[in-house]
Design a protein with these regions (language model features):
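Short, extreme N-terminal segment that most often corresponds to the first beta-strand
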Residues: 1-34
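Charged interaction segments
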Residues: 26-32, 44-129
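Surface patches in mature domains of proteins
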Residues: 39-41
């Protein structure tokens, strides 16, 4: 039986001017779908090498991400990043929390919240400090 982890996170990034998508992806991680899993390098224990390069990733792919830029370039609330999805064979609150904190610490984050449900283990909510 598979272990499923459900994630829904939203980040409000403040800045003067637009934050390039490439900079956001470099910190948050790349999306990988099921087909893309064959292009990832694995170690001798079948663990993903360079995990920090990707969004949190399960056995069928990573979480998904949408980036929205405020068309009003004079507004401090410049960008929102939404990260969501279901991870198969993944059951770690701690890894998601570590990833969430890394994302929050890398930008001027006005607000961020992440709800994680690990089936059979409950729900945890993380917020930026």
């Amino acid at each position: 039986m598979s272990q499923w982890t459900h994630v829904n996170a939203s980040f409000r990034l403040d800045s003067i001017g637009e934050i390039p998508d490439e900079k956001i992806i470099a910190i948050f991680g790349e999306c990988v779908d099921y087909k893309g899993m064959s292009n990832i390098e694995y170690d001798e224990n079948y663990e993903v090498k360079d995990k920090e390069k990707y969004l949190p990733i399960g056995s069928e792919g990573s979480l998904e991400m949408n980036i929205w830029h405020n068309p009003d370039k004079s507004c401090m609330a410049s960008t929102t990043v939404s990260v969501f999805g279901d991870l198969r064979d993944y059951g770690s609150f701690d890894e998601i929390k570590k990833w969430f904190n890394k994302c929050c610490d890398s930008f001027f984050v006005r607000q961020a919240i992440c709800q994680v449900e690990v089936e059979g283990a409950g729900i945890k909510i993380f917020q930026n400090n």
